[in-house]
From Swiss-Prot:
<keyword id="KW-0375">Hydrogen ion transport</keyword>
<dbReference type="GO" id="GO:0043531">
    <property type="term" value="F:ADP binding"/>
</dbReference>
<comment type="function">
    <text>Produces ATP from ADP in the presence of a proton gradient across the membrane. The alpha chain is a regulatory subunit.</text>
</comment>
<dbReference type="InterPro" id="IPR004100">
    <property type="entry name" value="ATPase_F1/V1/A1_a/bsu_N"/>
</dbReference>
<comment type="subunit">
    <text>F-type ATPases have 2 components, CF(1) - the catalytic core - and CF(0) - the membrane proton channel. CF(1) has five subunits: alpha(3), beta(3), gamma(1), delta(1), epsilon(1). CF(0) has three main subunits: a(1), b(2) and c(9-12). The alpha and beta chains form an alternating ring which encloses part of the gamma chain. CF(1) is attached to CF(0) by a central stalk formed by the gamma and epsilon chains, while a peripheral stalk is formed by the delta and b chains.</text>
</comment>
<feature type="binding site">
    <location>
        <begin position="169"/>
        <end position="176"/>
    </location>
    <ligand>
        <name>ATP</name>
    </ligand>
</feature>
<keyword id="KW-1278">Translocase</keyword>
<dbReference type="InterPro" id="IPR023366">
    <property type="entry name" value="ATP_synth_asu-like_sf"/>
</dbReference>
<keyword id="KW-0066">ATP synthesis</keyword>
<dbReference type="InterPro" id="IPR033732">
    <property type="entry name" value="ATP_synth_F1_a_nt-bd_dom"/>
</dbReference>
<dbReference type="InterPro" id="IPR020003">
    <property type="entry name" value="ATPase_a/bsu_AS"/>
</dbReference>
<dbReference type="Pfam" id="PF02874">
    <property type="entry name" value="ATP-synt_ab_N"/>
</dbReference>
<dbReference type="InterPro" id="IPR027417">
    <property type="entry name" value="P-loop_NTPase"/>
</dbReference>
<keyword id="KW-0472">Membrane</keyword>
<dbReference type="InterPro" id="IPR005294">
    <property type="entry name" value="ATP_synth_F1_asu"/>
</dbReference>
<dbReference type="GO" id="GO:0046933">
    <property type="term" value="F:proton-transporting ATP synthase activity, rotational mechanism"/>
</dbReference>
<dbReference type="GO" id="GO:0005524">
    <property type="term" value="F:ATP binding"/>
</dbReference>
Length: 512
């Protein structure tokens, strides 16, 4: 056999030319066990906490436990097909989510993937889900108002941009309604809204999206939904996904609002994960770091300093109480983290006082400095008067012989309660709130309240028609209040004149 050196060298040259240096190295482990969306994996010694893993069929997992001989991971998505012995790959990436204007108007799941049937989100930017909250130097104190459009909140428990205000109450007391009203009220205010639904029924989330669409609010809102049927890891992660999306607007010098509905269900999902990962249980079987779960989330809401762009992220976390018990574990945790709370009471709700805010224990620790001057001027004594009324009303049930001063306080309190009632999905601009509260709290030329002679059941109609009357006859008054944000003597005299004029008109209509 003839050996042809040139042919051999040609073959070798071709082989060398086709040789690639690229070697695919992947650290692979094996599933030891899988139960309820939590897998134990052997062989991933280099895995990092919070790292994403790749299971068969493209399913993702998140590393939560690092143990001596195995790794505990939460499976993101369907886990029924994952079996013992399945291979698992490290990705080397920490969980990230798409951010940007492209997400506005969309409904996404707990990992930021669209679930509204409108195709992919072509976002230009991504961000890590777990990042550190801004430090003290990067922050500025809360000083700009974030109007909710609800008289009871804007007057008594005002919220500022960058604040964390907890909404808590029993189920079916109007917690979500308060949050949705806040979104609707900020149409045209350059506030980008994020609604995170955790553990809700799909029908409930669909209804919220429909309401937002009807009022044209989806244009500036993103809905992040981890429904009741989704695995616990998705419910645990959804609030972090939402806050990461909202932070993009805060960090680009804009203003954002995030609503967590609700964090009780996130805590339950985290408890489920922790127990499956065999972490030691504490009070009410929650793990020891359940406080940190919420604190690291809510600390990411902030008002940034001018040097950092002056953006803000306001958070409205919602907590569901059991039988009005605000001293339970999760409610007390979140109360201590936030800058105030709005407590909704089922008794008030069933009495027809809606929004059913208990003024006595609802408080805003930093919002007072963000309230506009006009509102401070008219609503200064409102909280005290309502508290006195509640106290006297409790005693008045037992005695019929009341002195004149007590009767006067009760009559005034009844009218103030009526004033603060407001229909669902009908938020009101702050200047109109100021006009209504001025009419309810100020006195006329005879030293009596402007609405003292109005029957209690007519107060709601009086307030509605007063605003309509001013819009028609004195449109400049509301406009001036909106511009000046304060009541000077000129505006007060204009309001008094308008109220005198309206008193005659309203009485005629009432008698007719």
């Amino acid at each position: 056999m003839e050996i042809r050196a040139d042919e051999i060298s040609r073959i070798i040259r071709e082989q060398i030319k086709d040789y690639g240096k690229k070697v695919d190295v992947a650290e692979t482990g094996t599933v030891l066990s899988q139960a309820d969306g939590v897998a134990r994996i052997y062989g991933l010694a280099g895995a990092a906490a919070g790292e994403l893993l790749e299971f068969p069929h493209g399913t993702r997992g998140l590393v939560l436990n690092l143990e001596e001989d195995n790794v505990g991971a939460a499976i993101m998505g369907a886990f029924e097909h994952i079996r013992e012995g399945d291979p698992v790959k490290r990705t080397g990436k920490i969980a990230e989510v798409a951010v940007g204007e492209e997400l506005l108007g969309r409904v996404v799941d707990g990992l930021g993937s669209p679930i509204d049937g409108r195709g992919p989100v072509n976002a230009k930017h991504t961000r890590k889900i777990e990042i550190k909250a801004p430090g003290i130097v990067q922050r500025k104190s809360v000083h700009e108002p974030m109007q909710t459009g609800l008289k009871a909140i804007d007057a008594l428990v005002p919220i500022g941009r960058g604040q964390r205000e907890l909404i808590l109450g029993d189920r079916q007391t109007g917690k979500t309604a308060v949050a949705i009203d806040t979104i609707l009220n900020n149409k045209g205010n350059n506030l980008y809204c994020f609604y995170v639904a955790v553990g809700q029924k799909q029908s409930t989330v669909a209804r919220v999206v429909e309401i937002l669409k009807q009022h044209g609010a989806m244009e500036y809102t993103t809905v992040i939904a981890a429904n009741a049927s989704d695995p616990a890891p998705m419910q645990y992660l959804a609030p972090y996904t939402g806050v990461t999306m909202a932070e993009y607007f805060r960090d680009t010098g804009r203003h954002a609002l995030i609503i967590y509905d609700d964090l009780s269900k996130q805590a339950v999902a985290y408890r489920q994960l922790s127990l499956l990962l065999r972490r030691p249980p504490g009070r009410e079987a929650y793990p020891g770091d359940v406080f940190y779960l919420h604190s690291r989330l809510l600390e990411r809401a902030a008002k940034l300093s001018e040097k950092e762009g002056g953006g803000s992220l306001t958070a409205l976390p919602i907590i569901e109480t059991q039988a009005g018990d605000v001293s339970a574990y999760i409610p007390t945790n979140v109360i201590s983290i936030t800058d105030g709370q709005i407590f909704l009471e089922s008794n008030l709700f069933y009495q027809g006082v809606r929004p059913a805010i208990n003024v006595g224990i609802s408080v805003s620790r930093v919002g007072g400095s963000a309230q506009i001057k006009a509102m401070k001027q008219v609503a200064g004594s409102l909280k005290l008067e309502l508290a006195q009324y509640r106290e006297l009303a409790a005693f008045a049930q037992f005695g019929s012989d009341l002195d004149k001063a007590t009767q006067e306080t009760l009559a005034r309190g009844e009218r103030l309660v009526e004033l603060l009632k407001q229909g669902q999905y009908s938020p009101m601009p702050v200047e109109k709130q100021v006009i209504q509260i001025y009419a309810a709290t100020q006195k006329d030329e005879n030293g009596q309240g402007w609405i003292r002679q109005v029957p209690v059941e007519e107060v709601g109609r009086y307030m509605r028609e007063l605003v309509e009357f001013l819009d028609a006859r004195h449109p400049g008054v509301a406009k001036t209040i909106a511009e000046k944000k304060a009541l000077d003597d000129g505006i007060r005299s204009q309001l008094d004149a308008a109220l005198r004029e309206f008193r005659g008109v309203f009485q005629v209509e009432g008698q007719a």
